[in-house]
């Protein structure tokens, strides 16, 4: 009888150890997939990037920024500001991409009848958007307090 109790205790201990391990992820998440370093991939990524912005899906937009741009405003503040004070939706058409200065790729697009240019870089296996080069006016706005930001854009808050 004592032997059965000892075996049951050992089995219970082993089972609880297995259960504890099972509570975590079975497989570790892999590193982010690398983007192909091609113009076609960049055009596709830039199109998704602009479509996400137009639909108000701001998190993935911020996630595509380079480190210098992400240092301008936190992800949470970026999402909050755009959710509370959204831009008017505009149809954006990504048109072309070409190599630019200093390793940049310049993506040309049209928004509301205006031709614009964004700067993208290939860093660490990913295409990243450079807000500082592409839209320095937004950088100035993001550095304002939330109250100043709302007042500057004239949106209701």
Located regions from the model:
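Bacterial signal peptide processing site
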Residues: 19-21
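Bacterial N-terminal signal peptides that target proteins for export
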Residues: 1-6
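Low-complexity, intrinsically disordered terminal/linker segments enriched in charged
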Residues: 130-157
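Short solvent-exposed beta->alpha transition segments
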Residues: 33-37, 43-51, 55-102
